[in-house]
Amino acid sequence: MWLRFCAPALMAWYWVFFPSTSQAATMENDGQDGFWQRAKNNLSETWHNGQSQDLYVPAMTWHNRWTYSRQKIDKYNERPWGAGYGVSRLDSDGDWHGIYLMAFKDSFNKWEPIGGYGYEKRWKPVAGNDDFQLGLGFTAGVTMRDNWNYIPIPVLLPLASINYQRLSFQMTYIPGTHNNGNVYFAWLRWQL
């Protein structure tokens, strides 16, 4: 049953990551690409020409205390044990692109895999110091949760980071309603 949901996504990922010669040729044009073509180009460039391999270590989960009852918070796991792996690169503007796969213990202490693409516009807030950077962007991918029978669920979330040399503290916020969603999730990313 899950294959019915995954097959279209798997075919699309295959097409992006393993383009035919004719598809690869269409990626090289005069820079007048639309959003979809730029996204495919960035995914393909990151996959084929990643500058670093990355280790992901989930660091914390925080359920927003203004949107959750104390009973719910007391039942939830906020220590997301797990790990992940990815490839990443910096583009000509110094912006970060990454493709990742991570698995961690979710709020119910069940395994949750997530995989996708991340983009961050990078800034160097301290003049003359290229080692320290801040990032702001998004991540788009697919996750699967135990409480949803591990059906693939697409995600599009904000992404922010604090970076120093090869270490990044990345974070996102999952929006939601009362007692649902509204979760801050953070992880460490180490460039190997």
Swiss-Prot record:
Keywords: Acyltransferase, Cell outer membrane, Membrane, Signal, Transferase. GO terms for biological process: lipid A biosynthetic process. This is Lipid A acyltransferase PagP. Its EC number is 2.3.1.251. It catalyses: a lipid A + a 1,2-diacyl-sn-glycero-3-phosphocholine = a hepta-acyl lipid A + a 2-acyl-sn-glycero-3-phosphocholine; a lipid IVA + a 1,2-diacyl-sn-glycero-3-phosphocholine = a lipid IVB + a 2-acyl-sn-glycero-3-phosphocholine; a lipid IIA + a 1,2-diacyl-sn-glycero-3-phosphocholine = a lipid IIB + a 2-acyl-sn-glycero-3-phosphocholine. It holds the Pfam family PagP. Transfers a fatty acid residue from the sn-1 position of a phospholipid to the N-linked hydroxyfatty acid chain on the proximal unit of lipid A or its precursors. It comes from the Bacteria. The keyword Transferase applies. It comes from Musicola paradisiaca (strain Ech703) (Dickeya paradisiaca).
